[in-house]
């Protein structure tokens, strides 16, 4: 049992360090003024001006669409409260869920800015990324309380 606890702590520390390093590398990017659609179905997604790890619009830039607006709000929240703030991540998920409902109500007529990266691909990708972000945040926050 003690070995398992030690292994869990090591795994949590390892993943937290990897997450922090990845975010640090990604955050070194400059802000963007153009709507980008890249890697739409991977965790290295770049969507709009604000969606994607470390991907952010320049101050005063308007989001490219409704999903990008959710990402902009999330970026602002973690900037104020820290990257491991789970309430920021949950707020983002609620924003994306509202958008998903609006898309369904429009019978899929509500579309994003990109035909290359349609909402049907991008939304599941950002949801998966946020689930992973929440997991890392929980692990990181657990480690802080143990120290």
Curated annotation (Swiss-Prot):
Miscellaneous information on this protein: The enzyme has a preference towards palmitoyl acyl chain over linoleoyl acyl chain. It also has a slight preference for phosphatidylethanolamine over phosphatidylcholine.
EC code(s) of this entry: 3.1.1.4
UniProt-annotated catalytic positions: 74
Induction conditions: By auxin. By light.
Entry keywords, A to Z: Calcium, Disulfide bond, Endoplasmic reticulum, Hydrolase, Lipid degradation, Lipid metabolism, Metal-binding, Secreted, Signal
Signal sequence bounds: 1-28
Tissue note: Ubiquitous but expressed at a low level. Detected in vascular tissues and in the guard cells. Predominantly detected in pollen.
Organism for this UniProt entry: Arabidopsis thaliana
Subcellular location: Secreted; Endoplasmic reticulum
Cofactor(s) annotated in UniProt: Ca(2+)
GO molecular function terms listed in the Swiss-Prot or TrEMBL record: metal ion binding; phospholipase A2 activity
Annotated control of activity: Inhibited by aristolochic acid.
Similarity comment: Belongs to the phospholipase A2 family.
Biological role: PA2 catalyzes the calcium-dependent hydrolysis of the 2-acyl groups in 3-sn-phosphoglycerides. Releases lysophospholipids (LPLs) and free fatty acids (FFAs) from membrane phospholipids in response to hormones and other external stimuli. Regulates the process of cell elongation and plays important roles in shoot gravitropism by mediating auxin-induced cell elongation. Involved in stomatal opening in response to light. Plays a role in pollen development and germination and tube growth.
Disulfide bonds: 31-58, 35-64, 40-117, 51-71, 70-95, 77-88
Disruption phenotype: RNAi mutant exhibits delayed light-induced stomatal opening.
Swiss-Prot/TrEMBL catalytic activity: a 1,2-diacyl-sn-glycero-3-phosphocholine + H2O = a 1-acyl-sn-glycero-3-phosphocholine + a fatty acid + H(+)
Binding-site residues, Ca(2+): 50, 52, 55, 75
Main enzyme class: hydrolase
Gene: PLA2-BETA
Cofactor binding, note field: Binds 1 Ca(2+) ion per subunit.
Short motif (Prevents secretion from ER): ranges: 144-147
Protein name as annotated: Phospholipase A2-beta
GO cellular component term of the entry, any: extracellular region
BP GO terms, sorted: arachidonate secretion; gravitropism; lipid catabolic process; phospholipid metabolic process; pollen germination; pollen tube growth; positive regulation of cell growth; response to auxin
């Amino acid at each position: 049992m003690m070995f398992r606890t030690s292994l869990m702590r090591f795994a949590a520390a390892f993943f937290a360090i990897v997450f922090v390093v990845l975010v640090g590398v990604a955050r070194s990017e400059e802000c963007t003024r153009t709507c980008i659609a890249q890697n739409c179905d991977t965790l290295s997604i770049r969507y709009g001006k604000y969606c994607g790890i470390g991907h952010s619009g320049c101050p005063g830039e308007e989001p490219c669409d409704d999903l990008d607006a959710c990402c902009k709000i999330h970026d602002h929240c973690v900037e104020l409260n820290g990257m491991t703030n789970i309430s920021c991540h949950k707020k983002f998920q609620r924003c994306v869920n509202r958008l998903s409902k609006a898309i369904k109500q429009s019978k899929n007529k509500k579309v994003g800015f990109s035909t290359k990266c349609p909402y049907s691909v991008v939304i599941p990708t950002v949801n998966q990324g946020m689930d992973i972000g929440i997991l890392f945040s929980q692990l990181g926050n657990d480690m802080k309380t143990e120290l």
